[in-house]
Regions:
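Class I S-adenosyl-L-methionine
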Residues: 2-174
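Acidic-enriched, low-complexity/disordered segments with a strong bias for Aspartate over Glutamate
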Residues: 9, 33, 100, 153, ...
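Generic alpha-helical secondary structure signal
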Residues: 14, 18, 22, 64, ...
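Proline-rich intrinsically disordered, low-complexity coils
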Residues: 49, 55, 219-224, 234
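Generic hydrophobic segment detector
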Residues: 83, 92-100, 165-171, 188, ...
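Conserved S-adenosyl-L-methionine
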Residues: 125-231
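SAM/dcSAM-binding transferase cores
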Residues: 223-264
Length: 264
């Protein structure tokens, strides 16, 4: 067990199920499969109302195909463990939301992708860094002016920095629901990290999305067009954020028209 990480009952039960799946497979493969199945379940549930038409139809179908490919590689008895393990994650985060649950489990299980040199910064460290660097004043100005603001992590890992930033937002906006005024964007080159970050943002009830991509080659704090590489949280499609995107797009269109007229 990694030092400094507390093992709760939920975590212990999750680890028991995980170790059963590892009897005939490498632990990193099992972890990657778990994260993929959990993330696809959440992501496809989020876009289901939009999946009847393109471009979401292709995205939904592709992810369903990937889900079936992974789950069919396990025996029926093993398949039943995945929803049980996912439920344990949900219960643990309901009990204690202020944590990097998946990052801690990753270290607790001593899983590592040695080729990628992965190491997840402890949540306490991320929380300390965020408390020092997070510009509450600037964020407050943006929300007051625009009605909303965004927080972006270009190398999100399991999402610890974004989660700690959401804590700052919660403390800052005590009079109203920060989840309706701040959205969170993560990006990572490792698809398993994308899954981990996405799962945690979704289960924390945060609006936003996580992008699978190389930040050094293509930094994308704005919403890119290739939707197959984007994982939207459920609340991103809430009425509040749907209206915010609508007004934002209208504002952009208005500025373009104004700019075009001024040139004429």
């Amino acid at each position: 067990m990694a030092k400094g990480i507390k093992e709760t009952d939920y975590k212990k039960r999750f680890m028991n199920g995980f170790q059963i799946l590892c009897r005939s497979r490498h632990s990193y493969t099992v972890w990657s499969d778990c994260m993929a199945l959990f993330a696809i379940t959440l992501a496809n549930t989020s876009i289901l109302p939009l999946a009847k038409e393109e471009p979401f139809k292709s995205v939904y179908t592709g992810r369903e195909r990937e889900y079936l490919r992974i789950i069919k590689s396990y025996e029926k008895k093993e398949q039943k463990l995945f929803p049980q393990m996912f439920a344990l994650l949900v219960e643990e985060l309901e009990k204690n939301p202020n944590q990097d649950l998946l990052g801690e489990l990753y270290m607790l299980l001593q899983i590592s992708n040695k080729n990628a040199g992965q190491f997840f910064t402890p949540y306490g460290v991320c929380k300390a860094m965020t408390s020092v660097t997070f510009n509450r004043k600037e964020l407050g100005k943006t929300v007051h002016k625009e009605g909303y603001a965004s927080v972006y992590d270009c190398a999100c890992g399991a999402g610890a920095t974004l989660i700690s930033a959401s804590e700052q937002c919660k403390e800052m906006f005590k009079k109203y629901n920060y989840q309706n005024h701040v959205y969170f964007v993560g990006q990572d080159v490792d698809i398993t990290c994308v899954y981990m970050c996405y799962i945690q943002l979704a289960l924390h009830g945060l609006a936003g999305y996580v992008i699978h991509g190389n930040t050094l080659i293509k930094p994308e704090p704005e919403l890119p067009k290739d939707l197959e590489n984007i994982y939207f949280t459920p609340i991103w499609f809430s009425d509040v954020w749907t209206m915010r995107r609508l007004f934002h797009n209208q504002d952009i269109l208005g500025r373009k028209l104004k700019h075009g007229c001024s040139r004429d």
